[in-house]
Amino acid sequence: MVHSKSLRIAFFGTTSFAAWHLHTLAHLSTHQIIAVFTQEIQISTCKSFLSLHKIAKKYNISLFQSRTLSISDIIYIIKKINVDLIVVVSYGLILPQEILNIPRLGCINVHGSLLPRWRGPAPIQRALEYGDSITGITIIQMDLGIDTGDILHIMPCKIFPKDTSCTLSNRLVNIGSAMLSQVLDQFILGTFTLIPQDSTYATYAHKLNKQEARINWNLSAIQLERCIRAFNPWPISFFQIKNDRIRVWDAEVSNQNINNYSSSTSILPGTILAAHPNGIYVVTGSGILILTMLQISGKKITSVRDLLNAYKEWFKPNSVLE
């Protein structure tokens, strides 16, 4: 049954983050999701991963893979289905003005940061990488810029010391889904307000790539620990041993001094100081990083305690990791 004050919505999204918002809209909302546009099928090791394709199928929503469509095709479809509003969540492509102009209420975007900080495609990961203590969700009225539109709603979210991109994303989904429902109600009632962003405070969250996940031991232990959490569950921080890629799923910063392990004043970053059941202690550009959860190529994720039972020779003290 269609609610008398429901909106006809087209949903644009690609990631699991988007899929959870679609799930909430389709499951709890009185609004009609007429069509879903997505870039491509995605997979993830995150336990909370949700497929946007499965959600569309479950709720019998027409799904279009936009990489196989031209802009003119998308424009034609949007006009034909006669939507009131386009909702964009983690879509990954910029919508041209021709599409933004079609819905009578325009297009809104649910973004995983406190805009204008961390505009761009990887706001959750960059907030963790740079050691932010707080982030949040911002819903904006879209314009042609990258996350530059006026703010409809904004809500903060604390970042905890052991948060990964996966755990932080899970909390942001809950916040974003609730906020989206509120904003849609405001559109129906005509009670929404728009607040311009102050671009002098803007930062940009560049897209992640696999190569930046390679551990640079010249960075500080604090920086590396942040990167390991930021790049979990993708692309996963890694280093090399014997031509094997070793992925690092968890680590912590040691409060011990290098002098506790060696009297040398010229230890190379990447040098293993000790390999204990509780972790592998590695010299960095500043401080010691303790590796606690690792994964050898083709093997399961395992604790260092279990790993050393079979690969102790790989982690001898004074050897240098690549």
Curated annotation (Swiss-Prot):
Q: What Gene Ontology terms describe what this protein does at the molecular function level?
A: methionyl-tRNA formyltransferase activity
> What EC number(s) does its UniProt record assign?
2.1.2.9
Q: Name one GO cellular component term.
A: cytosol
Instruction: Name the domain of life.
Output: Bacteria
| Regions that span the bilayer | none
Q: Which residues bind (6S)-5,6,7,8-tetrahydrofolate?
A: S113, L114, L115, P116
Q: Which UniProt keywords apply?
A: Protein biosynthesis, Transferase
- Report the SUPFAM superfamilies cross-referenced here: FMT C-terminal domain-like, Formyltransferase
Reactions performed catalytically: L-methionyl-tRNA(fMet) + (6R)-10-formyltetrahydrofolate = N-formyl-L-methionyl-tRNA(fMet) + (6S)-5,6,7,8-tetrahydrofolate + H(+)
Pfam name, any one = Formyl_trans_C
Q: Which InterPro entries match?
A: Fmt, Formyl_trans_C, Formyl_trans_C_sf, Formyl_transf_N, Formyl_transf_N_sf, Formyl_transferase-like_C_sf, Met-tRNA-FMT_C, Met-tRNA-FMT_N
Q: Which NCBIfam families match?
A: fmt
Q: Which PANTHER family match?
A: METHIONYL-TRNA FORMYLTRANSFERASE, METHIONYL-TRNA FORMYLTRANSFERASE, MITOCHONDRIAL
Give the family per the record: Belongs to the Fmt family.
What function does the entry list?
Attaches a formyl group to the free amino group of methionyl-tRNA(fMet). The formyl group appears to play a dual role in the initiator identity of N-formylmethionyl-tRNA by promoting its recognition by IF2 and preventing the misappropriation of this tRNA by the elongation apparatus.
| Name this protein carries in UniProt | Methionyl-tRNA formyltransferase
